[in-house]
UniProtKB/Swiss-Prot annotation:
This is Type III pantothenate kinase. InterPro entries: ATPase_NBD, Type_III_PanK. PANTHER family: TYPE III PANTOTHENATE KINASE. It is found in: Cytoplasm. Pfam families: Pan_kinase (PF03309). It comes from Dictyoglomus turgidum (strain DSM 6724 / Z-1310). Belongs to the type III pantothenate kinase family. Homodimer. One of its GO terms (biological process) is coenzyme A biosynthetic process. Keywords: ATP-binding, Coenzyme A biosynthesis, Cytoplasm, Kinase, Metal-binding, Nucleotide-binding, Potassium, Transferase.
Amino acid sequence: MILTIDIGNSNIDLAYFNGNKIVSHYEFETKKFSTSYEYALIIEWTLKREKLQEKDILGVALSSVVPSLTSAFIDAIKYLFGKPPFVVEPGIKTGISIETENPKEVGADLICNVVAITEEYGHCGIAVDFGTATTFSVVEKKKFLGAAIAPGVGTSAFALFEKTAKLPQVDIKAPESSLGKNTISAIQAGIVYGFAGLVDGILERQIKELKYKPVLVSTGGWAKRIVPYTKYLKEKDIDPYLTLKGLYYLYLKNL
């Protein structure tokens, strides 16, 4: 059994792999001031839920975009399993050529996503990750060509609430019409249909710059709320575990 842990800005995803299949998945809120002891307790709790012991885990893979938590998790994993995890960081084997100005600054989540695309979906693809940020990662012929990064759906909605005096926080869902008849439906229309337009606009530009027709795969917590209203993305191509799959494949490449 392989344990994979993906630390994001909003959530921490944890999955157990048996072979190349996810047998269980857990999601926790990211708390940036928690200690390694607290995270060790969380991991230990998932082990008990799965009726597993530490000796059943052959390896642990860690991806993080929150530097302050990376060391806490490394210490927690060392404490539980007696050895450090594999960490997605510059210098690891990816099987992908990073064609950017500074490969070392490419986020671990973007690397995981393009590796998963290459391993599971084909030689050319775009991963759209609807997280705290909305990212568009492009891979073609095992080359990471670049990315686009936009604010996340929830991030934008919260900023609208925080920076305005009279606009309320709303449940982010698509209203019946883009013509909002009240403040709540107007905000919902702006966020949902606005992000759908943002996604289509970026994808249209990226697709034109590629030599081959890309596979389009979406992931992230906001995907199900936005994808149905886009032109390019399909609900059937939402892969909620894309980043974790990429992390698993990276672990195997670095054994």
